Swiss-Prot record:
Function (record text): Catalyzes the removal of a penultimate prolyl residue from the N-termini of peptides.
Cofactor(s), by name: Mn(2+)
A single GO molecular function term of this UniProt record: peptidase activity
Domain of life of the native organism: Eukaryota
Pfam families membership: AMP_N, Peptidase_M24
Descriptive protein name: Probable Xaa-Pro aminopeptidase pepP
């Protein structure tokens, strides 16, 4: 974290080696230093204060100036680990010092309800996830908070309730009371006073008061989510009930992220980048996929992301052609590449990052050529992004670039427009370009059409235009999966465009996917992912001393 201090510190530590900074006539000013378990370190001094710099072990490569009027030095090795930028890091940490903006989210939800029903009034009602016991066991199952509840509360407590009065704007959170029998096992729970200080709500009561609260007079209508209502909650006091529109309203509101949500996703990316870098450094020195999965999870937990956004995909060799490979238990010997699709979850918000790299530290010519095509697909598609852009058009561009690249390698042959019209490129790029990201890895509001007769768009998880404030993944890929490609080779409509002899050289490549998390802005985008994808940089890290 960043630390502010009025006492100048002229010695910093980078990876256990002391950095000595001698400054002549240093004024009494504030200094900021950054440290983390990833051995990232910034030594920062006012621009006018720099006189001389001596570093033991870590050599500095460049100086950068922040918008705060500070100039800071970046070690060569650090550039591999961390490239968010000082100003974004400071802004992110500052935002996350505040409360999760539950009231802002509630107002967005009401705005959507009133776009459908202009006179919408009444009470929003939501329940947290229940404590569920593992079948035939006395242990509770791992807890995952309901996202609809979290969006309006920021509360990660099980067995809780929430109401929001549309007319008054008053939000009330109900949390479990103290159970003396449980204290000895799990300790004291959060008190209502502590919860009120922690969460962005107006009132905190205990759950034994929920029915009395719902029975208050003059409440015209209740809005709830049908499958998420306890049996003892009847809403008899409400003359009107709507159990469908609230879910839709929350799903649509979640598409446009608040500033706080963006900071959470950026933080999840920062943590996951540490894990991805650790895997890069270790891949040449371990024997099994499971070793790398364990390493990523370890780094995630150590840096603040106890949960994973999804099960990690650690696919070596030809297994990388399986989009959602789950085994993560195969040996690495004799295989070319590793595809790592892994993201930590930070306070209920996901990151979703994919990188592909050579296990032995050097891409083969075939692997490098495919990687370069995929990287071009990603960079050109990302450059299109801004509010209002058609995601269908961006996805279409990815296929056009893939076709041109595969034609240049003679894997495909013929006219590029005819290949696109035939949809032959789907054999090599069978999934959508990306999806919304937020509390869920495949977040809400994308309106996919899995019944689309056009196979090019069938698995595109976002349809239509991208609004400002949305976060989308950009994850093109090219795969050499026999199960998918061989039917195309047997179909004359597609076989005429595929050079089967050339294809034989590429089966071992498996698959290449590169994935970043992108915030859509009014006039462009902000890439929230800083994990390395430059080939030279990746190979340098893999071949570094472990």
């Amino acid at each position: 974290m960043f630390r502010l201090s009025t006492t100048p510190r002229f010695t910093r530590c980078f990876q256990g080696r002391r950095q000595r900074i001698s400054i002549a006539q240093i004024p009494p000013v504030q200094f900021i230093s950054y440290s983390s378990s990833a051995a990232q370190s910034l030594s920062i001094l006012p621009n006018s204060a720099f006189r001389s710099l001596r570093v033991c072990g870590a050599r500095f490569q460049r100086f950068e100036r922040s918008q705060l009027g500070l100039e800071y030095c970046v070690p060569r090795r650090q550039i591999h680990y961390y490239s968010m930028g000082l100003d974004k890091k400071v802004a992110m940490d500052k935002i996350l010092e505040g409360k999760y903006p539950a009231k802002e989210h509630a107002r967005k939800v009401v705005e959507y309800l009133r776009s459908k029903e202009p006179e919408a009034e009444g009470v929003l009602y939501l329940e947290a996830q229940k404590t569920v016991m593992i079948e035939d066991n006395d242990e509770a199952a791992p807890f995952r908070q309901r996202r609809y509840f979290y969006y309006l509360t920021g509360c990660d407590l099980p067995d809780s309730y929430f109401t929001y009065n549309i007319s008054t704007g008053k939000s009330t959170l109900f949390i479990p009371p103290i159970d003396p029998e449980s204290v000895i096992w799990t300790g004291l729970p959060l008190s209502p006073e502590e919860a009120l200080a922690l969460y962005d709500v107006d009132e905190v009561l205990t759950t034994d008061m929920i029915n009395a609260h719902l029975a208050l007079p003059n409440q015209s209508k209740v809005w709830a989510i049908a499958p998420q209502i306890s049996t003892h909650i009847t809403f008899l006091e409400f003359p009107q009930k709507d159990f469908t529109l609230l879910k839709e309203a929350i799903e649509e509101a979640r598409v446009r992220k608040s500033e706080y949500e963006v900071a959470l996703i950026r933080k999840a990316n920062e943590i996951s980048t540490v894990g991805h870098t650790a895997v890069l450094k270790a891949v040449k020195h371990v024997k099994n996929e499971r070793d790398l999965e364990a390493l990523f999870i370890k780094e995630s937990i150590a840096n603040g992301a106890r949960e994973q956004a999804y099960h990690s995909i650690v696919a070596s060799g030809t297994a990388a052609a399986t989009l959602h490979y789950m085994k993560n238990s195969e040996g690495l010997d004799g295989k070319l590449n590793l595809l790592l699709d892994a993201g930590g979850e930070y306070k209920c918000y996901a990151s979703d990052i994919t990188r592909t790299f050579p296990i032995n530290g050097k891409f083969t010519p075939e692997s490098r050529s495919i990687y370069d095509i995929v990287l071009s697909m990603q960079s050109q598609c990302t450059s299109m992004l801004k509010a209002g852009v058609s995601w269908d058009e961006v996805h279409l561009l990815a296929h056009k670039i893939a076709i041109e690249g595969l034609l240049s390698l003679n894997i495909l042959k013929g006219d590029k427009d005819e290949i696109l019209k035939a949809r032959t490129s789907v054999a090599f790029f069978p999934h959508g370009l990306g999806h919304y990201l937020g509390m869920d890895t495949h977040d809400t509001g994308g309106h996919p059409n899995y019944e689309d007769k056009d196979r090019l768009f069938r698995y595109l998880r976002v349809r239509g235009t991208l609004p400002e404030g949305s976060v989308v993944t950009v994850e093109p890929g090219i795969y050499f999966c026999r199960f998918i490609i061989e039917p195309y080779l047997k179909d004359p409509a597609h076989a005429q465009y595929i050079n089967a002899d050339i294809l034989e050289k590429y089966w071992e490549v498996g698959g290449v996917r590169i994935e970043d998390n992108i915030l859509i802005t009014k006039d462009g985008y902000d890439n929230l992912t800083t994990s390395i994808k430059d080939v030279d940089e990746m190979e340098k890290i893999i071949n570094s001393v472990y």
